[in-house]
C-alpha cells in the first residue's frame, strides 16, 4: 500500500465532495454523489476561460462552500441553526448602543451657513487621500462630498491622548490619516481592548447618528493625524444621505440569515456603515494571500470562489486556480480572514455583473460580535472534519503559500 500513488487532484475532489456532504447532510449519499459529480462534470465542460481567470457560466454548482472564503456561507443552509444561533443579548456586544434614531425627515430644512475650514492645496490632497476609502462617503454625490471636505478640520494627536471617551456626548466624526489607535470598551468596571486602527479607517459615527453617548474610548498609541467633521455637518449631509440608503437596504439586510441573531437596532447600524460596490464580469473582488480589509454580502449577481491548486499548473508554470464554490444573492464571503486574522484563503471573481454590500474590518469587528461565534464555529467544524478524514484542512492556516 505504501507504493500506491494518489492521482493528482483526487484529494481536492474528495474534499470538496465531503464538505458538501457535511453541509447539506443528504439522506442518500449515492444519489447525492451522482448529482454532485454530474454537475461538476457539466461545470468543467462549460468552462471556457483561461486557467487563471474565473470560469464563466451560470451553473448552480457549489462544491466547497463554507470551506474557504473567505469561503462562503450559504443563505439556504441550516448550518447556523445547527450551531445554536446566539440569542440576542446573550453575548457580549463590542458596541451596544440603543437609543431613539435620529430621523432626518423630521428635521426642517437647515438655513445655517456652510462650515468651511480653509486648507492649503497640500492639506486638501492629504484629506482626499485619507477619505477615498471611507464607506460613509461612498454614496455622496460630488457636491455633498465637496461640502464634507470643506467642513473637515485637521487634528494632531500625541501618544496616550484620548480622542473620544466612552460615555461622552458625540461632537465629531473622525477619519484617520496616520497613527495607531486602540478601541477600548469598559463594562462592569473592566476595560478591554476590542480592536485597533492602524493608519486608516474612521470612527465616531454611531454617537452622531443615534444621539447617544460614545460607545467606546479611542486612545492614540502613536503620534498621529486625524480629520474631524463637526456634528451639524455630519447630520445634515451624511445622516440624511444614509436615511435614503437605509430605505433601500434594510429589508435586504433583514433577509440575511447570519444577521438574524442581531437585534433590530444593530441591523440598522450595519445599514448605516455598509457601502455598496459594483463589479463587472470577470473582475477580481478579493485575492488569495492578500491581507483582508472587508466583508462582503452579495446583493445581486453571482461570485466564483477559487483557490490555487498545489497539483495543477498553468502554461506559465504557476499554480492554477480551481473553482471550489459559487455564491449568490444573500450569501456572504470574506469573513474567514477577518475571523482568523489570516491572509485571504481564496480569490473571488464576479460572474456577470455583481453588486455587493461591503463592510470594512473595523465595522465588522465592532458590529458583528454576536455573529462571530457562528462564523468561528463554522470554520472549526469544517476544519475538524477535514483533518479527521484527510489529515489536513487544505492549508487554511497559511493560505498564502
Swiss-Prot record:
Query: Which residue windows does the record flag with biased composition (Low complexity)?
Result: 46-58
Q: Which UniProt keywords apply?
A: Acetylation, cAMP, cAMP-binding, Cell membrane, Cytoplasm, Membrane, Nucleotide-binding, Phosphoprotein, Repeat
Matches recorded under InterPro entries: cAMP-dep_PK_reg_su-like, cAMP_dep_PK_reg_su, cAMP_dep_PK_reg_su_I/II_a/b, cNMP-bd_CS, cNMP-bd_dom, cNMP-bd_dom_sf, RmlC-like_jellyroll
User: Which Gene Ontology molecular-function terms are recorded?
Assistant: cAMP binding; cAMP-dependent protein kinase inhibitor activity; protein kinase A catalytic subunit binding
Output one GO BP term.
adenylate cyclase-activating G protein-coupled receptor signaling pathway
Tissue-specific expression: Four types of regulatory chains are found: I-alpha, I-beta, II-alpha, and II-beta. Their expression varies among tissues and is in some cases constitutive and in others inducible.
Using the record's annotations, give every residue carrying the modification Phosphothreonine.
Answer: 212
Residues that coordinate or bind 3',5'-cyclic AMP 2: 258-401
Q: Where in the cell is it found?
A: Cytoplasm; Cell membrane
Q: Which residues carry this modification: N-acetylserine?
A: 2
How is the polypeptide modified once translated?
A: A second phosphorylation site has not been located. Phosphorylation of Thr-212 by PDPK1 seems to attenuate the activity of PKA, perhaps by strengthening interaction between the regulatory and the catalytic subunits.
Question: What domain of life does the native source organism fall in?
Answer: Eukaryota
- GO CC terms, sorted: cAMP-dependent protein kinase complex; cytosol; plasma membrane
The UniProt annotation places 3',5'-cyclic AMP 1 binding at 136-257
Q: Nucleotide-binding among the record's keywords? A: yes
Where is the region Disordered? 43-65
Q: Which Pfam families match?
A: cNMP_binding (PF00027), RIIa (PF02197)
Tell me the segments the record calls region Dimerization and phosphorylation: 2-135
Subunit structure, as described in the record: The inactive form of the enzyme is composed of two regulatory chains and two catalytic chains. Activation by cAMP produces two active catalytic monomers and a regulatory dimer that binds four cAMP molecules. Interacts with AKAP4 and CBFA2T3. Interacts with the phosphorylated form of PJA2. Interacts with MYRIP; this interaction may link PKA to components of the exocytosis machinery, thus facilitating exocytosis, including insulin release. Forms a complex composed of PRKAR2A, GSK3B and GSKIP through GSKIP interaction; facilitates PKA-induced phosphorylation and regulates GSK3B activity.
Query: What function is annotated for this protein?
Result: Regulatory subunit of the cAMP-dependent protein kinases involved in cAMP signaling in cells. Type II regulatory chains mediate membrane association by binding to anchoring proteins, including the MAP2 kinase.
Q: Which family does it belong to?
A: Belongs to the cAMP-dependent kinase regulatory chain family.
Protein name according to UniProt = cAMP-dependent protein kinase type II-alpha regulatory subunit
Source organism = Bos taurus
Amino acid at each position: 500500500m505504501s507504493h500506491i500513488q494518489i492521482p493528482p487532484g483526487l484529494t481536492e475532489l474528495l474534499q470538496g465532495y465531503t464538505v458538501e456532504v457535511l453541509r447539506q447532510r443528504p439522506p442518500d449519499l449515492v444519489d447525492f454523489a451522482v448529482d454532485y459529480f454530474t454537475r461538476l462534470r457539466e461545470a468543467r465542460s462549460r468552462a471556457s476561460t483561461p486557467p487563471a481567470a474565473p470560469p464563466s457560466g451560470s451553473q448552480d454548482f457549489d462544491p466547497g462552500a463554507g470551506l474557504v472564503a473567505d469561503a462562503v456561507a450559504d443563505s439556504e443552509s441550516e448550518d447556523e441553526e445547527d450551531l445554536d444561533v446566539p440569542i440576542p443579548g446573550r453575548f457580549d456586544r463590542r458596541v451596544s448602543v440603543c437609543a431613539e434614531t435620529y430621523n432626518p425627515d423630521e428635521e426642517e430644512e437647515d438655513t445655517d451657513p456652510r462650515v468651511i475650514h480653509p486648507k492649503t492645496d497640500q492639506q486638501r490632497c492629504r484629506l482626499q487621500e485619507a477619505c477615498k476609502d471611507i464607506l460613509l462617503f461612498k454614496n455622496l454625490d460630488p457636491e455633498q462630498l465637496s461640502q464634507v471636505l470643506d467642513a473637515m478640520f485637521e487634528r494632531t494627536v500625541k501618544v496616550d491622548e484620548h480622542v473620544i471617551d466612552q460615555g461622552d456626548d458625540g461632537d465629531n466624526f473622525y477619519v484617520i490619516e496616520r497613527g495607531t489607535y486602540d478601541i477600548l470598551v469598559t463594562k462592569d468596571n473592566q476595560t478591554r481592548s476590542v480592536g485597533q486602527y492602524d493608519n486608516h479607517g474612521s470612527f465616531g459615527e454611531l454617537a452622531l447618528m443615534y444621539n447617544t453617548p460614545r460607545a467606546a474610548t479611542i486612545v492614540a498609541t502613536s503620534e498621529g493625524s486625524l480629520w474631524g467633521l463637526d456634528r451639524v455637518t455630519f447630520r445634515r449631509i451624511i445622516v440624511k444621505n444614509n436615511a435614503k440608503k437605509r430605505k433601500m437596504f434594510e429589508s435586504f439586510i433583514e433577509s440575511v440569515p447570519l444577521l438574524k441573531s442581531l437585534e433590530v437596532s444593530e441591523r440598522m447600524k450595519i445599514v448605516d456603515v455598509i457601502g455598496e460596490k459594483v463589479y463587472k464580469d470577470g473582475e477580481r473582488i478579493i485575492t488569495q494571500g492578500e491581507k483582508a480589509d472587508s466583508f462582503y454580502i452579495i446583493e445581486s449577481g453571482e461570485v466564483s470562489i477559487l483557490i490555487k491548486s498545489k497539483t495543477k499548473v498553468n502554461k506559465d508554470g504557476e499554480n492554477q486556480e480551481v473553482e471550489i464554490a459559487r455564491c449568490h444573492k444573500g450569501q456572504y464571503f470574506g469573513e474567514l480572514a477577518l475571523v482568523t486574522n489570516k491572509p485571504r484563503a481564496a480569490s473571488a471573481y464576479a460572474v456577470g455583473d455583481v453588486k455587493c454590500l461591503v463592510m470594512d474590518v473595523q465595522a465588522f469587528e465592532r458590529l458583528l460580535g454576536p455573529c462571530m461565534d457562528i462564523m468561528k464555529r463554522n470554520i472549526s467544524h469544517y476544519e475538524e472534519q477535514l483533518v479527521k478524514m484527510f489529515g489536513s484542512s487544505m492549508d487554511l492556516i497559511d493560505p498564502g503559500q
